[in-house]
């Protein structure tokens, strides 16, 4: 059978290693595995969410309301936008997929920073688009605008805060990039970790309403990180109605589960869980900064729920990640991103204790 | 912004109307709404599944094992195939999407019966492919082979049992169609309702192992119907490893939720719920056949969990569906499929009582 030519050029996304794999491969008991690899919320699941799941555990046979009326109402109140400005995805990932499929083809190019979320490239390659990267992992106006004028990309991705590096781009810089490109280029502002950046520094806070006046900009958000719902797969895109309507043409019906819809609605009701998550995070990340300084390890200042350690030639990120894995500590090796570094999700106090104990031994 | 040209030609799928909509629009209490529109399992959720959901309601923050190791093991045992023969989708729908994206482009055509599952057309149109339909809604060898030779379609869809008509194609006929086309055409055998057909008549039972010797055939199955897990969005494709590997390139990571993965694994453990679902169905569908005969209404003999009534010029499917909707009874109008008919999910005894009471009044 002859497959579409684009398939020749696609590598599949390497997900963070699951606890189950460590259990299977190294015979470590699940309770002894510390997973700091996938930027899951270390507090766990919001008890209010657990309650919603439990009380709806008997409607797994029912399809969700495909209009997602209630969730859109909740999000429109939360972000001060209209229902027609919102599209829901199975994670903001899926909205990235809709965008890619609606806009890209084999004649297109897309522009992103040197090191950023891996799915931008994968979804773009699925459409045969050419990948252009700036020199830096940070989103720098000069680099983006220069590349924009050279390549006229169809899509520019601004991941802020950036994953897997943790740095953020200021609202001012993002708006400058947006103002610097014409209306036929879509600018995707991916705020998957925005709650952490906004809590740390208002200069880096970007809200959908900051962007809604631009017809060629879409804001992406997710329930996976600060809301602690990674396993439920719900994210959203917010943009002008005309753009949302086009993206809807690529949305499959029932693209989130019945329970996912209900928990996302619940998550919109109360910010206290997000606030508690951020408070724990802000307290615990200091330990990672201190540890790095004390051990002569570089790190990128983080605006996210993880921290990125960068190693010099004395340490090898692959060796370190593998050694930790055998000890039941899962972190994210950044070798596949071309970096000699690791991304570590900030865990609970106990998880971080375990990490530091093993990490100190592994690097010594 | 310039969108891909294919978007000009896409209509979005019209999902069955949710209970929430009837509640919102007609002010009917949720408990008084009878939804027989989406072929959901009327027995409800398997209590064993409810238990799994309840006991995992506190891990919504954790991403699923993206290798889906355990689920693939369970499915490979169930169907006597290897892990490498399996791809999991968010419903078998998503596997249809992978297939479409891996194989189709603006130079392709796809072949399907006159009336069949709406998503075949939608996913094909998203890739710009041309839609060819046979004359009949039944999958007839002569019609398929004639159209095959005329159009050389890239994909042939065989939906058996067929949705929204309910008829099934015998294993012999399906194999004849497969043998009649060359290896560059993929034949999709969509068995979303296969459990019902197999229970009714072994001649219509098709198992993945019946098809695995063909490199250009894929079998699709789902947990949404007989397993009663429509709201969890889990389906699968089974084919030769080479084909599965290509489809994997279009699979996004974490494409089903953590709870969906767990419940699908649980569903593979025990067939008694499926058997009970089918037993209820076989008993209740007789009432629909009897009612039709007594009221001079034609119907298509059903191999699925629904029945399709076909009206003559004295009855209008849109008027009838709308009238029932206002009474809180949701069925599926087939006008958008070009049929003056309705598709009714076979409900519980009580649901069917309600349906017959209102339906008798509406058509009188």
UniProtKB/Swiss-Prot annotation, chains A, B:
Cofactor(s) essential for the protein: pyridoxal 5'-phosphate
Domain of life from the UniProt record: Bacteria
CDD domains according to UniProt: AAT_like
A biological process term (GO) from this entry: L-histidine biosynthetic process
The protein's annotated pathway: Amino-acid biosynthesis; L-histidine biosynthesis; L-histidine from 5-phospho-alpha-D-ribose 1-diphosphate: step 7/9
Disulfide bonds: none
Keywords from the named record: Amino-acid biosynthesis, Aminotransferase, Histidine biosynthesis, Pyridoxal phosphate, Transferase
EC number: 2.6.1.9
Record's subunit section: Homodimer.
Family: Belongs to the class-II pyridoxal-phosphate-dependent aminotransferase family. Histidinol-phosphate aminotransferase subfamily.
Protein name: Histidinol-phosphate aminotransferase
Organism, scientific name: Sulfurovum sp. (strain NBC37-1)
């Amino acid at each position: 059978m002859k497959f579409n030519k684009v398939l020749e050029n696609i590598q599949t996304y390497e997900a963070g290693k699951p606890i189950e794999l460590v259990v299977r491969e190294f015979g470590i008991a699940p309770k002894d595995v510390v997973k700091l690899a996938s930027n899951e919320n270390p507090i766990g699941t919001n008890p209010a969410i657990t309650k919603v799941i439990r009380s709806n555990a008997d409607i797994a046979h029912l399809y969700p309301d495909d209009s997602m009326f209630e969730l859109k109402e909740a999000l429109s109140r939360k972000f001060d936008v209209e229902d027609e400005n919102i599209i829901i995805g199975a994670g903001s990932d899926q909205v990235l997929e809709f965008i890619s499929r609606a806009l890209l083809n084999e004649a297109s190019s897309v522009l992103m920073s040197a090191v950023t979320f891996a799915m931008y490239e994968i979804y773009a390659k699925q459409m045969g688009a050419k990948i252009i990267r700036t020199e830096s992992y940070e989103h720098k106006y000069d680099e983006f605008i220069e590349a924009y004028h050279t390549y006229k990309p169809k899509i520019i991705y601004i991941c802020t805060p950036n994953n897997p590096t943790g740095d953020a781009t200021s609202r001012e810089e993002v708006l400058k990039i947006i103002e610097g490109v014409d209306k036929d280029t879509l600018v995707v502002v991916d705020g998957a970790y925005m709650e952490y950046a906004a809590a740390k520094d208002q200069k880096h806070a970007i809200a959908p309403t900051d962007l809604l006046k631009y017809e060629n900009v879409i804001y992406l958000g997710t329930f996976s990180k600060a809301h602690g719902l990674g396993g439920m797969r719900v994210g959203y895109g917010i943009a002008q109605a005309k753009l949302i309507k086009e993206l809807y043409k690529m949305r499959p019906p029932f693209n989130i589960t019945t329970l996912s819809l209900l928990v996302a609605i619940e998550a919109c009701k109360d910010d206290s869980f997000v606030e508690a998550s951020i408070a724990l995070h802000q307290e615990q990340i200091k330990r990672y900064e201190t540890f790095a300084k004390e051990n002569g390890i570089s790190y990128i200042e983080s605006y996210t729920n993880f921290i990125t350690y960068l190693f010099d030639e004395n340490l090898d990120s692959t060796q370190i990640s593998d050694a930790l894995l055998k000890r039941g500590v899962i972190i994210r090796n950044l070798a596949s991103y071309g970096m000699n570094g690791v991304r570590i999700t900030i865990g609970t106090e106990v998880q971080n204790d375990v990490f530091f104990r093993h990490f100190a031994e592994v690097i010594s």
